[in-house]
Amino acid sequence: MLVIAIGGNTSSRTALKLRDYLTEYFSREPSMLIIPTATSDPANFSEIQSFWAKIFKDVCLLPLHKKVNSFLSEEELHNKLQNYDFVFFSGGDQKRIIQLIRGHSIHRFLLEKNSSSLFAVGGTSAGAAALGDLCILSGSPARFESIKITSGLGLLKGYVVDQHFKERKRFGRLIYVVLKWKINGVGIDEDTAAIFRSDGELLKILGSGFAWFFEYDKDGRLGLCYKKEAEGEV
């Protein structure tokens, strides 16, 4: 399974690069199912779907939100998920994803897909933050005591993901989480996608920014590297 974490504010150019990468991976253009649980207002659904419908030919939005009744049974929901290659969590507040998705049948379905080679799951902004073993719910980089952590969806093994990384100066926040919780971290800039295998192996960086990797070793030491689209390392 591929796991795709995007740092937010995705441009059409980067979205098209992602489509091309996935098309090569699947040997055809994949179908996309958007889960907009994180958004604050269901009125945003049409805008979210409209953006991605300009990128992929087959795009569906599943109106799973605490303010909306989707009227789908567990069986209907499972059948719908089976029909799509790429499940994608849009942005907003990651707490909503954790509360509505973690432990839900959708979550179980995605975990079962972990060993499937021809499947992808991803998210942008809050959707990316929810993908790892841990999820940063909130917290200021200037006040570490304000940082709130919970279990993530566990789709990207061994990682905690932070987003809008360079733009919101979240270096200190992520380093604090990595050292305190003894986990690897990746911070992803806006308009940047990091593509992994579900076991944490990095495959590709796409977009205009960097993905910043903070590796925690068993001796409590922290290693840092950062990568751009060309996969160059500094």
Regions found by a protein language model. Name each.
Residues 1-86, 90:
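N-terminal beta1-alpha1 cap of cysteine-dependent amidohydrolase-like domains
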Residues 1-28, 39-46, 137-234:
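C-terminal and late-domain segments of enzyme folds
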Residues 9, 92-94, 127:
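Short glycine-rich anion-binding loops that position phosphate/pyrophosphate groups of nucleotides
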Residues 32, 87, 125, 161, ...:
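A residue-level signal for conserved active-site and pocket-lining positions in enzyme catalytic cores
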Residues 45, 71-74, 97-101, 133:
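Short, conserved acidic/polar surface loops in the N-terminal third of protein domains
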Residues 76-78, 84-86, 94-118, 226-234:
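Mature, structured domains of secreted/extracytosolic soluble proteins
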Residues 96-100, 107-168:
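Class I SAM-dependent methyltransferase SAM-binding "motif I" and its flanking Rossmann-like core
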